[in-house]
Amino acid sequence: MRRILFLITFLSIALATDAQRSCFFTHYSSEEGLSQNTVMSILQDHKGNLWFSTWDGINRFNGYSFKTYKARQGSFISLTNNRVDRMYEDPSGFLWLLTYDNRAHRFDPRTETFEQVPAAGQPGSTSNVNTITVLPCGTVWLLTENDGAIR
């Protein structure tokens, strides 16, 4: 009788363990509204939106749909390159983007505008930016190829 009780208990535990929920994934691609299927980085902003940088702009996902932001020909308030490799958010809610051509941009989600960050604060000049670092205090550092560090 003890063996039967032990066997029933053991099988109950084994079946309960096997009944655990499997991992579930949802696949998002250009068919669901993503601008391009090559995703370089993902960022969750302070509002809970997910941002995806792709080879064709950046995409905001609010949990239901995507909105795409990309370069516009001839616009001064735009990206220099649609291929965005990395994104960072500062405490003010601005997104800092690093494009494939090593240019840094700041995106304001409130106005939905881009601003190219000039080298060392000189309008019209550019630097090859390798890394963007956002400190917890809000200070943003751009580490460049030949122009040192820009704050």
Q: What feature does the model see in each segment?
A:
Residues 1-151:
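Carboxylate-rich, polar loop motifs that coordinate divalent cations or form catalytic acidic clusters
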